[in-house]
């Protein structure tokens, strides 16, 4: 039996129910569970040293269970965070489960800033390791709310933007929600000197999302609204580009979209996010043309 296994066996014994005369010598239940948690933690760290991450994560969870029984929820949350770190690379679903439980403890304690930090990590885990954009969106939005409650506006906006971006993903495609999110973020950033540099990007993304919904009247109305919020927007390349895109959709001409995109890309490189939505706008026009031809035959 390895040293880690011996420590686990001792801890398991301390966690076992004790009754009758034996309970007189075993000490209080709380103390026994605290001792067991210490033993589990030692064993988990040994597994860590041996690079047996999944085993370490499992034993950190056992430590958390013992700490909960000892009514040491703060310690339990910390053990669950350690379990999450161990699972993160090879067992992301277990990592997410542990992180969720830890965040619940932080929330119950009113530690919303710490909870927000780990909620954002959870969202990133869903996004990058588990390919689960829907859960990632929910986690980013909740992290944003907690950051906002702690007056961390920049961090809140970062989470809200991530959620909005994921709402535009191929798996979700909720462009209405994304458009409304970008618009709200922009409005709340108007008087923020640091966030003001990002305004034109928020404006442009909101308009793109409306165009992806074939809703050029709303996109055109947004252009006017954004200029009323920030008159400098009218002098940007993003405004000129958006104006041409609205015209292209209104005319039902994908070539206008393609030409405007190429012209903009020559000076300001379009990222993959925007390219995908621009392609969707073009394809929507072509699809509607095909349907119109079918109606005539």
From Swiss-Prot:
Name of protein: Vesicular-fusion protein SEC17
Listed CDD domains: SNAP
Protein family membership: Belongs to the SNAP family.
One of the record's GO cellular component terms: SNARE complex
GO MF, one annotated term: soluble NSF attachment protein activity
Pfam family, one: SNAP
Localization of this protein: Membrane
UniProt keyword annotation of Lipid metabolism present: no
GO biological processes: autophagy; intracellular protein transport; SNARE complex disassembly; vacuole fusion, non-autophagic; vesicle fusion with Golgi apparatus
Domain of life: Eukaryota
Function: Required for vesicular transport between the endoplasmic reticulum and the Golgi apparatus.
Membrane topology: Peripheral membrane protein
Signal peptide: none
Main location: membrane
Keywords, comma-separated and alphabetical: ER-Golgi transport, Membrane, Protein transport, Transport
């Amino acid at each position: 039996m390895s040293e880690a296994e011996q420590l686990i066996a001792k801890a398991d014994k301390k966690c076992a129910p004790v009754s009758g005369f034996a309970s007189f010598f075993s000490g209080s239940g709380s103390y026994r569970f605290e001792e067991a948690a210490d033993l589990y933690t030692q064993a988990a760290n040994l597994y860590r040293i041996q690079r047996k991450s999944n085993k370490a994560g499992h034993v950190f969870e056992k430590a958390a269970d013992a700490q909960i029984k000892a009514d040491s929820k703060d310690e339990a949350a910390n053990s669950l965070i350690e379990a999450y770190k161990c699972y993160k690379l090879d067992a992301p679903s277990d990592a997410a489960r542990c992180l969720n439980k830890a965040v619940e403890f932080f929330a119950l304690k009113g530690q919303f800033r710490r909870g927000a930090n780990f909620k954002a990590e959870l969202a990133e885990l869903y996004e990058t390791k588990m390919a689960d954009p829907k859960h990632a969106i929910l986690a980013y939005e909740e992290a944003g709310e907690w950051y906002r409650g702690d007056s961390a506006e920049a961090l809140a906006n970062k989470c809200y933007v991530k959620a909005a971006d994921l709402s535009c993903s191929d798996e979700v495609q909720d462009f209405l929600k994304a458009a409304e999110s970008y618009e709200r973020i922009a409005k709340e950033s108007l008087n923020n000197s640091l966030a003001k540099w990002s305004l034109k990007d928020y404006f442009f993304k909101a308009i793109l999302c409306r165009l992806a919904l074939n809703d050029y009247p709303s996109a055109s109305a947004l252009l006017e609204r954004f200029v009323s919020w920030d008159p400098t927007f009218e002098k940007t390349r993003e405004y000129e580009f958006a104006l041409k895109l609205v015209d292209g959709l209104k005319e039902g001409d994908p070539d206008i979209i393609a030409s405007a995109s190429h012209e903009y890309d020559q000076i300001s490189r379009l990222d993959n996010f925007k390219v995908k939505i621009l392609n969707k706008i073009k394809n929507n026009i072509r699809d509607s043309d095909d349907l119109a031809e079918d109606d005539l035959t």
